[in-house]
């Protein structure tokens, strides 16, 4: 008889422990007085007598923060590893040829040449025909020291002052 009584007592004690551990006691204010209610252990109290099922992992903000940081780190590391293993091909740009000669210094301090400054052929004489400044400005340089494609020098209008404001307004 002592044996079944001990088993019954252990069973009742186990049920009592399970009932008290498996419930959360929650409360909220309704007006001036608190209202009490009970939720299960895997549910959260949400306020007005409702219990919300939630996994504990959803409440761990630092877990999700570290998970996202890990994903970003892996993506970044993968990007840099891919860039190192498969580098982009180097694009060889053609060399830009800017060979020109300057005007010779003026022989006399009072004598100046007429016309804008010009670019000359490195292999030929430097002449400035006053009437044909555009032809001289766009002259192609055949004896380029680099041997690549040659480009004409920039036009000579870069060194002239802009037109006055009144003239621009009058033209429109």
Swiss-Prot record:
Main location: membrane
Gene Ontology MF terms in the entry: enzyme binding
Positions on the Extracellular side per record topology: 23-60
Subcellular location: Cytoplasmic vesicle membrane; Late endosome membrane; Lysosome membrane
Membrane-spanning segments: 61-81
Residue numbers spanned by region Disordered: 139-172
Stretches of the chain found on the membrane's Cytoplasmic side: 82-172
InterPro entries according to UniProt: VOPP1
Disulfide bonds: none
UniProt protein name: WW domain binding protein VOPP1
Gene from which this protein is expressed: Vopp1
